[in-house]
Amino acid sequence: MKKLLFGVLVIASGLVFFSCTQKSGFLGADTLKTIELVAADSQIDNIVEMASYESDVFSLGNSSVTTFSAGLKSAVPGGGFFNNMFNLFPNFKLRYMRGICPDLTITTTNGGFPKTMTVDYGTGLELANGHILKGKIIIVLSAAPFISGSTRTVTFENFCADLVCISGTSVKTRTKDTQPKFSETCNFTVTLANGTTINRTAEHVRSWIAGSDTEFNPADDVIAVTGKVVVSDSKGNEYSKTITVPLLRTGVCKFITKGVIEYKNSTGKFATVDFGNGDCDNKASRTTQNGTTEITLGK
């Protein structure tokens, strides 16, 4: 993996390597506004998907959901909940830099459901892949997570990843498929470092194609995401995005590693973004009628 510095959504003035051949099927000329919008939005996709996976790490662990109860908190290895976790699942600490994990509190009524999990990152906690998280993720589980029809309601409270802050709620529902699969509806507000706010309403399907049977071991996790997002922002931009090739998220990479998103506005399709062939790097390619450009997903 490339060594990367922090600082997401700092958009470079030259997004380099334009093709000289025009592409058919795209409407509207390239403008600086379009270039910046797609580059920034691709970085936001990466952050939002990382935050969703982070909620999965905790709420899909049957041991934490069904075995542990209230008041389990420890920000450092060697005490309480995470002492048990490190003994039972030593690979879990590999997700967090120096093995320092967020506080976790689980509250329940008489040991049953619903259960509420609060994951607290405090004022800043670093993942092993370089993201810095702060704030809280609050997860309410209606039942054990792999029971068909069970729901997980995930709320982001004062939550930020690097320089991107997320507020709002998603609901993940276990489908009847044999493969671990969850339908997801999201209503998020994303705030960037420059004060821009972005409203995102999404319908996704998240399929665990590997790793769901090894609790708290991010090394073998692979998730495929499909669906659509409707976006509006404080600068007056409105558009929709459809995932035409499933996005792949692994448990150890900082970035989306594969997949294609198609962008449309009121005039039609204006861009696509290809996240690559599965390699773990911070590059994606953006295609419009003027050709293909390499963009950066973060630092």
Regions found by a protein language model. Give the residues of each.
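C-terminal motif of bacterial Sec signal peptides marking the signal peptidase cleavage site
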Residues: 16-19
